[in-house]
């Protein structure tokens, strides 16, 4: 890529981040009333009876921008009567999927014994999964990617097809 193409791409990416930041700023503003409207798609996911929400936090540092955004989101959920469990992947040892296929043969039990063994029951109980990740090299963190890959262990019978999912 030549210099002109690089600068053009950088400007487009910066503009996208700034426009996206305007929406994020709304959630971080403490003066915003808690009973204000969520965006329509999120309101659709979180409307109705109390739901169990599992928040998967994949940022490497606590108290960073992603953590602040997630806490604001959780605050809105709790004020609407939902039950929230927050899990920090960065403080757990979670390996990537080995692709061994053991989970597909042995009652969906993953051969890798690590922090995912604590997350699987939480995932089974929840109605909604919120995955929060900063952008590292224009993609989600490796911890979140490993988490998603490891969900393969419980996917064989498609037991959880109706879980709502939000990506922050």
Can you say where each PLM-predicted feature lies in the sequence?
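Twin-arginine (Tat) signal peptide motif
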Residues: 1-7, 21-22, 30
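N-terminal beta1-alpha1-beta2 submodule of the flavodoxin-like/Rossmannoid cofactor-binding fold
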Residues: 10, 14, 19, 31-154
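Short, glycine-/small-residue-rich phosphate/pyrophosphate-handling segment
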Residues: 159-168
């Amino acid at each position: 890529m030549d210099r002109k193409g690089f600068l053009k791409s950088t400007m487009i990416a910066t503009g996208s981040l700034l426009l996206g930041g305007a929406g994020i700023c709304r959630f971080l503003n403490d003066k915003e009333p808690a009973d204000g409207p969520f965006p329509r798609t999120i309101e659709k996911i979180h409307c109705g009876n109390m739901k169990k929400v599992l928040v998967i936090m994949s940022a490497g540092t606590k108290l960073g921008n992603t953590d602040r955004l997630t806490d604001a989101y959780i605050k809105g959920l709790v004020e609407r009567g939902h039950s929230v469990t927050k899990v920090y992947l960065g403080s757990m040892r979670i390996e990537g999927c080995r692709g061994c296929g053991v989970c597909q043969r042995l009652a969906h039990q993953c051969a890798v014994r690590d922090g995912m063994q604590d997350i699987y029951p939480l995932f089974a109980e929840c109605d909604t999964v919120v995955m929060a990740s900063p952008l590292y090299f224009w993609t989600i963190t490796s911890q979140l990617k490993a988490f998603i890959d490891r969900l393969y262990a419980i996917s064989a019978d498609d037991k959880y097809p109706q879980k709502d999912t939000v990506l922050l």
